[in-house]
């Protein structure tokens, strides 16, 4: 099976890019992935509505190539030149199959696009994100983690910030590790900490191996995201053996937590995810 995955977005960080990289690696036994539309292919898999253009997908439709749309959340028009939701709607109408990242995403988005579909929960690369491996030593203990790929307000850093202040008062030797993108003002003014709190900023990291080292070295993850459809960061942290502290339990986090508690870390692996995708995609091209 040869699959064309459009990859036209200039952004190189985020869930869509991580998913493409993971899917490519774990589907290699049964699929060949191309990002070149000129190459002959059996199927078009849209990893996210903001990853490609209407023109690209119209061409697929004209060539009668089966189209599969993967949906996580409603794209923000404010971040996509006012075209995010209209692109999502059009792609859904043209798709032969829609795959939602979580049951929450299906419940939220299905009434808008009026297209039923499957639910396949995300999985992460279990060969990288695992309890075994290098750990980073810290003179402080316990280590709390807060990580956000982007500065979207729904990540709610302010909640982690507020709660960590109280954690620090109760645990003077604790430290907060911060990973990801933050405003220049946060970086300049010590993330608004004002009582000598212990913290370390690791920067925006696009190296999965280093991320795994950080995640497995942390004791707790302060999870604050509001209605994230299926947090890759949360899944990766679970696979590394850490313990999330849910300061917000909304969106797909409910399902991730339930699946982990019912089936263990194996359910959150890319192996399980790609097995389910294989079955779904084979049904489209038969």
Question: Whereabouts are the PLM-identified features?
Answer:
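Active-site proximal beta-strand in glycosyltransferases
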Residues: 44-45, 58-77, 99
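Aromatic "clamp/platform" in nucleotide-sugar-dependent glycosyltransferases that forms part
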Residues: 225-226
């Amino acid at each position: 099976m040869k699959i064309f995955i459009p990859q036209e977005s200039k952004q190189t960080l985020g869930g869509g890019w991580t998913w493409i990289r993971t899917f490519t690696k774990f589907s290699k036994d049964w699929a060949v992935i191309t990002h070149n539309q000129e190459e002959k292919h059996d199927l078009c898999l849209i990893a996210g509505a903001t990853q490609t253009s209407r023109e690209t997908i119209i061409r697929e439709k004209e060539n009668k190539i089966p189209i599969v749309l993967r949906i996580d959340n409603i794209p923000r028009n404010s971040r996509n030149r006012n075209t995010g939701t209209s692109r999502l709607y059009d792609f859904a109408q043209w798709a032969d199959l829609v795959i939602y990242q979580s049951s929450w995403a299906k419940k939220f988005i299905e009434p808008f696009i009026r297209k039923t579909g499957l639910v396949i929960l995300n999985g992460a690369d279990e060969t990288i994100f695992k309890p075994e491996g290098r750990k980073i030593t810290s003179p402080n203990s316990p280590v709390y983690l807060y990580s956000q790929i982007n500065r979207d307000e729904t990540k709610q850093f302010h909640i982690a910030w507020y709660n960590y202040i109280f954690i620090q008062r109760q645990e003077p030797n604790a430290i907060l590790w911060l990973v990801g993108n933050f405003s220049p003002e946060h970086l300049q003014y010590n993330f608004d900490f004002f009582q000598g709190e212990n913290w370390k900023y690791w920067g925006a990291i696009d190296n999965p191996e280093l991320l795994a080292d950080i995640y497995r070295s942390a004791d707790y993850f302060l999870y604050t995201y509001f209605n994230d459809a299926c947090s890759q960061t949360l899944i990766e942290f679970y696979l590394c053996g850490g313990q999330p502290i849910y300061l917000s339990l909304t969106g797909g986090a409910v399902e991730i937590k339930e699946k982990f508690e019912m089936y263990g870390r194996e359910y959150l692996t890319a192996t399980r995810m790609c097995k389910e995708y294989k079955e779904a995609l084979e049904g489209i091209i038969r």
